[in-house]
A protein has these predicted regions:
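Radical SAM/AdoMet-radical enzyme domain recognition
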Residues: 1-19
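Auxiliary Fe-S-binding modules of radical SAM enzymes
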Residues: 26, 31-35, 39-157
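Charged helix-capping and loop-helix junction motifs
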Residues: 16-21, 50-52
Length: 157
């Protein structure tokens, strides 16, 4: 049995909760699989957590568990182009960026390819991110014919 759970503000938004949950899952012979970012639907404003904090919670929890718990991937977002994992925050060429990758993508060639979004401390979902380094589009967007402006909801129609 593989496990997955959303990361929700007011419910499980601390590394300690995730660390203990993953350990308990392994004790029960379950395999930690995904930590999901709360989807941008419903009561979004109550449950949402900025992406950098999601990554920080994941990183801190992950660093406190043994290898048998480190089967988990996250924080991830299931969006129109695929399942996107936030790998971290970095500074590249003087620009603070989010480092991302596709765990699964509409095009298999996208899988496991790192890409970068401009850092936004308020962003809570992929559709709120812009490409880094002054680019107009993420590398995969040429395969989609339409897209609303950033921050206007869904990235793809």
């Amino acid at each position: 049995v593989r496990t997955q759970s959303p990361l929700l503000r007011h419910i499980n938004d601390s590394p300690e909760i995730w660390r203990e949950m993953w350990r308990k899952q392994v004790d029960l012979s379950c395999i930690p699989y995904y930590m999901f970012v709360a989807r941008d639907t419903g009561a979004k404003h109550y449950f949402e957590i900025p992406l950098e904090k999601c990554w920080d919670i994941f990183r801190k929890a992950y660093s406190q568990v043994s290898g048998i718990c480190r089967t988990v991937r996250g924080p991830s977002m299931s969006d129109e182009p695929g399942k996107i994992q936030l790998l971290g925050v970095a500074e590249i060429k003087g620009e603070k960026v989010f480092v991302l990758r596709f765990i699964q993508g509409r095009n298999p060639k996208w899988v496991d390819m790192p890409f970068f979004a401009a850092y936004d401390p308020k962003a809570t979902w992929f559709s709120e991110l812009r490409p880094a380094f002054g680019k107009d589009y993420f590398f995969f967007e040429h395969e989609f014919p339409t897209r609303p402006m950033y921050g206007d909801g869904f990235l793809f129609e």
